[in-house]
């Protein structure tokens, strides 16, 4: 095996940043997406190991490849080995609780990884006959999400929110709940975000029990990071590495998987960085002409099959808050739901700070969720919308100037707003309140009771940071 690999070696002709041209012997050209390996020593004696991926065949036995790590120390004339296959990464239980880079190498220095089962990162999306065509809700146990912007099993959700409004805590709670309620696992792909954030997430996951560093197999998540200091090749492919690990849990272990991508915009950005170096003509706003194809290739692999599902939650950065920018606009075409986090709610102490009026879902249709769920959700939105409209009047004239009917709407809306808050399992260490998983049936029952007027006499403090409606009543008795 090794002798045949040794025969298929090429040499570097030119290096332009992360992109290099490599010449191979006639008749021994590597395929597109093949992984190429450069090993040796720099002039200063440092060990050199760079993995590249073939992107183009230029003719005259020359290929153009993108490096997955820094190209410092490389020179023209250095030997390059064709591995004969695409980049492959470890999959399965061995990945749980560990941190990987784009190449599937562990970076947490926490012991060896079992490389006996690996899969290539470039794979075809499931065929039509394998897909699950049933529209079903993915219950998260989080009231505001399940009622007003429900997630689709095997769907894609966009997560919008600035810094410090609770994105990380919401992500950790979802990871915790899918493990407990669905027996599923999660895969977190950190694409082009800050190293500090990745480290904070890892430490918080250890504190909250999502990662068990004494027995990794009991962990609920695998982490794959390609941070913003990495070359664009790594940031462009780290999403595929995370997706490949998630696909194994879905297809082989037959599990429900949550795939987090933070941030999907950085995946597009990395592609645009290398696009010009690959000689492609830029399209709108300087993005790569293959933007829709690259996005589609990633998103189409995220789906439900007859044996399991991958539900993906993707943080979406919107450059300059311009929703018509080609990167977010292309992402929106693939999303089934959006969860928008509001700084205004976070400042009131209402967590999770999910904006009930801005968050949307294509699943909120009466023929999918049922008439009762649909009508309750619409009534909640209507009440909150009316409260929002009345806030200017309240600020200027006060509550006393409102009609009896509007005062009742405001009272119920404030109770609804507080009842949309919920104590999280992963936040127990900060809040001191035990976490609550609220089923969809309990959620609908609770909001119907508030809107029907059954709880008009209950003080609004009783609705804050509780689970189901029974807890509201018992808390009200304690407050008396």
Swiss-Prot record:
Q: What are the GO MF terms of this UniProt record?
A: ATP binding; ATP hydrolysis activity; proton-transporting ATP synthase activity, rotational mechanism
Give the CC-aspect GO terms.
Answer: chloroplast thylakoid membrane; mitochondrion; proton-transporting ATP synthase complex
Leading EC class: translocase
UniProt keywords, alphabetically: ATP synthesis, ATP-binding, CF(1), Chloroplast, Hydrogen ion transport, Ion transport, Membrane, Nucleotide-binding, Plastid, Thylakoid, Translocase, Transport
Keyword Transferase included in the entry's annotation: no
Q: Which Pfam families match?
A: ATP-synt_ab (PF00006), ATP-synt_ab_N (PF02874), ATP-synt_VA_C (PF22919)
Q: How does this protein sit in the membrane?
A: Peripheral membrane protein
Q: Which HAMAP family does the record cross-reference, listed alphabetically?
A: ATP_synth_beta_bact
Q: What does this protein do?
A: Produces ATP from ADP in the presence of a proton gradient across the membrane. The catalytic sites are hosted primarily by the beta subunits.
Family per record: Belongs to the ATPase alpha/beta chains family.
Name this protein carries in UniProt:
ATP synthase subunit beta, chloroplastic
**Which species is this record about?**
Euglena gracilis
